[in-house]
Amino acid sequence: MRINVVPTGKVGEVEFGMSREEVRTLLGKATEFYKFEDDSNTTDDFGFCHVFYDQDNKCEAIEIFSEAEVFCNGTLIFPTDFITAQKAISDLEEDDEGLISYSQSIGIYAPDGEMESILFGKTGYYNE
């Protein structure tokens, strides 16, 4: 599966700010769950991705797993390696769990140096 992303805008056809119902119409049946103990809202699991919602049930972030290939500006950025991702997204910086871009709301989860997932969020997602 190929997914084209516009950072802070949309992931595939899903746009940040869409309602949970609109996302489910596009992506299909979801399993609802709490990803973390302190979450105030549920996350939708669509198999290849998790979709996170704010208090108003508006899409605020999407985490994609290795079942999909993610492209940004025509360049494969996931799954790939740190160097390739950093060339495509110039302000990615290393953190404890992988790579993060605060300005583009992108987080790459790679706790052991290998990419396991990539998260795209709405503007300011990592600053909240």
Locate each region found by the language model.
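Non-cytosolic coordination micro-motifs
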Residues: 1-41, 46, 56-128
